[in-house]
Amino acid sequence: MTDRLISGDNHIDLTYCPPDLWSSQAPAKWKLLVPRVEELEDGCHWFVDAVDRGMWNGVGPGFLPYTKGVFAHIDEMKDVGFEWNYQRGAKPRPTTPELRLADLDRDGVDAEIIYGCLMINDLIADGAQRSWANSIYNTWAADFAKASDPNRVFPLAIVPNNDPKDAAAEVRRCAKLGLRGGDLAFKRMGLPIYHKDWYALWEAAAECNFPISFHSTGFKGLRTPDTPAMEKEYFVQHRLVRSALFQLDTMEVLVSLLASGACEKYPDFNFVLGESGQMQSGCG
């Protein structure tokens, strides 16, 4: 049997999403708060919660403009044809089906699991608005997979993190849409993971055979250099410590799930600790 290469941690960052995805469907009270794109002098910018976050179709989760020499791997992408065009009408490669498939073929990747908009729940303050924004993305992601290749492209749903009942309902809805799993942002959850109210979500995930992933976004308890001068002098040391501790925040997730009793109560509930090495995930 031929070995297959499957990426378990690809992404669609917010910067690459369709510019009118949320603003075209937003209730009047949220029109200026939901993720939306405005055209400025240097191109289109994303605004979230009425704050300018940076470029549409920019570089990665930081919404950055492309600058040669900053990131070597970004320069390599540029050399093989990846373009960052900030004007309306551009086709971002990560969210244009035929271009995404072409990039998978170029890299020799047979299939991919896609995390989406990891920071969106950090950028939106209101819980109800976050939940709504998640559902809009999830519907789009299911359609995107079908328009690409549903046997190769597997987007994860963004699971609402403000209310366990909303999260459970969204899991059931997304399972019906054809999505195969979801990502739960645990940094701004309405309740701690070990709280019994989250049983509603674990039950829905087990019922729908819908694994829940927790993707690390970095350990927030790390001490940073005291001054810009110190940061410059100890740049390598600080980056080394930060990189070594990056996945430490998912230890909170693992211990919280074990302490909650979820694994005993829902043995068919499966979970994944994203960017945290390899482990046997699942409660059963």
Predicted feature descriptions by range:
Residues 1-284:
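Helix-coil boundary/capping segments in enzymes
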